[in-house]
Amino acid sequence: MNAERDLAPLAPSVVRALNDKLYEKRKVAALEIEKLVREFVAQNNTSQVKHVILILSQEFALSQHPHSRKGGLIGLAACSIALGKDSGLYLKELIEPVLTCFNDADSRLRYYACEALYNIVKVARGSVLPHFNVLFDGLSKLAADPDPNVKSGSELLDRLLKDIVTESNQFDLVGFIPLLRERIYSNNQYARQFIISWILVLESVPDINLLDYLPEILDGLFQILGDNSKEIRKMCEVALGEFLKEIKKNPSSVKFAEMANILVIHCQAADDLIQLTAMCWMREFIQLAGRVMLPYSSGILTAVLPCLSYDDRKKNIKEVANVCNQSLMKLVIPEDDEMDEAKQSITLSAEPNPEEPVSKPEAASTGSLDVSGDSSVSNASVCTVTSSERIQVTLNLDGIVQVLDCHLHDTSIGMMTRIAVLKWLYHLYIKTPRKMFRHTDSLFPILLRTLSDESDEVILKDLEVLAEIASSPAGQTEGYGPSEAAEPRPGQVELHVPIRNSQLSSSGPKGLECSPSTPTMNSYFYKFMINLLKRFSSERKLLETRGAFIIRQLCLLLNTENIFHSMADILLREEDLKFASTMVHTLNTILLTSSELFQLRNQLKDLRTPESRNLFCCLYRSWCHNPVTTVSLCFLTQNYKHAYDLIQKFGDLEVTVDFLTEVDKLVQLIECPIFTYLRLQLLDVKNNPYLIKALYGLLMLLPQSSAFQLLSHRLQCVPNPELMQSADGSRASASSRRPASSTIDYTELLQHFDKVQSKHLEVRHQRAGRAEQPERRVVL
């Protein structure tokens, strides 16, 4: 009985009914409690109201006995109904015990708790919003409840709460975000569905700006996007689409920088939907935020570049990644080359930044993920920022180069990715050459190795980068000279090309020391030529399969004369004589047959200028590594007497199958259009006796082969000199009309030829283990 007095003002019959196992009796007791509380409200007796709620909470709802807990729940709901609009004054006391019952092991009790809370919330309406977080927390747990009745009850309560939030303007979003951020990482499907449904509701409320807090929940949203449930994935897609729609409508208020790294992470996701969605977001971010995204370029490239090599199964991702890559590349501007110096300026913070936003892209009217569309790209941020903020948006070139270098070293990456990496390097050397040359020494080796790539497209793009490095004015500085080219060089007096005054003033002494043969290129040009030849020497297969292709492309990208001049210069000092001979043969074939070298051939054919004569001498000294190519060079330059003198010396050489094969090829070449002028000169027998002698010399060297027959037939067509007397007898040949040719010391050139061939003979003997070779001479 003492217990009954302790529970006053509740009557003993009410107490007994609340503890009864039958629902009907508990319901009758609840009606009595409702009546009692109404009387207290009418009397304005708040203390008694609080006392009743306390009793129902402590003695019933939180009781150890399940039936008592059920009675307490229905009693608290009855109190709320009786209080009506005044229930807001007691919500904390009413809600807390009910929420505690959400964790009860008995599913029936959890259901009654849902029912009770529904009645409490229905009465209180907007007054429950200050308690929204605890209600949301409780509901998020019930959303994953295994009992279907409990889940159904929680959904009913959930809809009611959403209606209240939608119609109210008092929702505390700031207080709710931490809880949402925590709950969004739940792995339970039902909890995720619950979270997404609430995000969609909050997005739809005009007075709630959830976009401001998107950085807090974006990562969680992308994780939910990978859920196994198609329904949840679809809901998440819709939510992300709505956010993207809002971002496009009002980009100036979006915190792009805070979300950039989140997108970078999910652009690398294994799940296709997550990756595609993140990539679409990245595309929009780059195009809307512009240069605000530059500090995150290295991360973006890490995510985007591998996607460029995807096959058709991931075509959508590949296309969007390509747009991202192109858009990001356009953000790099020449001013980035000066940014470091600008930041170091003391007065810069007080000065306006010269970079002004170009234009604001028109906001898209839909938030759907457009895979193939490429909206207009802006080279500047659409966000309205102060000058000091713009100064901080700088290009992290070190990070970008590190990523590009890493991808070039990775042999597993696809062809399109390698091409994109090389395009980036080329673009950076064009836009920010001064900064890029700080990285050239580290990039140079991998760029050279890339010349061995299987793809012609990769090699072409690689050559463009190397050519830009070799020709950029930024490379001709005191700080960036290659060490290899600074070595003393034998024969420098003879091989040195005259330097124009303008080039002297621009290049400086450092540049001349590094590359005396190539004054129009920078200090890296000569280094490039040295290392390219080293590459060919160590990789003979590369020389055989791609050597001509590489050199011909370089002739399109760089000065042809400089390429041949420098390579001949380097080969002059080559210790591997067999390689030198092979390389000279390759260069000679290119010189005589490639359309890219038409102008250089014309220049050498006439030898009218000091530069052309100097080039001839330089080429000749290296061409001596290969006797037949030396003769062909003399034919090209119309030095027929010297060609004859050389052929006379062939009798002292070791005649091998390779040697005869080269003579055979030279005969075939003489029949080609390139030597049309030479064949026409055979008509002028009187003025070209040494041409005819030289050709007869080749004929005598050849065995009775098809080439022998070809040359023999050609020589049979040479007219009788006496028959040609009716022609202008005073006419001199082209070679005899060149007064400048007398400035070339042909005797010294012949001596040089003898020295080089003696070295070759010595090396061959050493290889064969022969001490001596008997002299053999062909008398012509």
Curated annotation (Swiss-Prot):
Its main location: membrane. GO terms for cellular component: endoplasmic reticulum; endosome membrane; PAS complex. The keyword Repeat applies. Pfam families: Vac14_Fab1_bd, Vac14_Fig4_bd. It comes from the Eukaryota. Residues 365-377 have a biased composition (Low complexity). GO terms for biological process: phosphatidylinositol biosynthetic process. It is found in: Endosome membrane; Microsome membrane. InterPro entries: ARM-like (IPR011989), ARM-type_fold (IPR016024), Vac14 (IPR026825), VAC14_Fig4p-bd (IPR021841). SUPFAM superfamilies: ARM repeat (SSF48371). The keyword Membrane applies. Keywords: Endoplasmic reticulum, Endosome, Membrane, Microsome, Repeat. Residues 348-377 are annotated as: Disordered. HEAT repeats lie at residues 5-42, 89-126, 171-208, 212-249, 438-475, 558-596. Belongs to the VAC14 family. The C-terminal domain (residues 523-782) mediates pentameric interactions and is necessary for the formation and maintenance of the PI(3,5)P2 regulatory complex. Scaffold protein component of the PI(3,5)P2 regulatory complex which regulates both the synthesis and turnover of phosphatidylinositol 3,5-bisphosphate (PtdIns(3,5)P2). Pentamerizes into a star-shaped structure and nucleates the assembly of the complex. The pentamer binds a single copy each of PIKFYVE and FIG4 and coordinates both PIKfyve kinase activity and FIG4 phosphatase activity, being required to maintain normal levels of phosphatidylinositol 3-phosphate (PtdIns(3)P) and phosphatidylinositol 5-phosphate (PtdIns(5)P). Forms pentamers. Component of the PI(3,5)P2 regulatory complex/PAS complex, at least composed of PIKFYVE, FIG4 and VAC14. VAC14 nucleates the assembly of the complex and serves as a scaffold by pentamerizing into a star-shaped structure, which can bind a single copy each of PIKFYVE and FIG4 and coordinates their activities. Interacts with NOS1. This is Protein VAC14 homolog. It comes from Gallus gallus. The gene is VAC14.
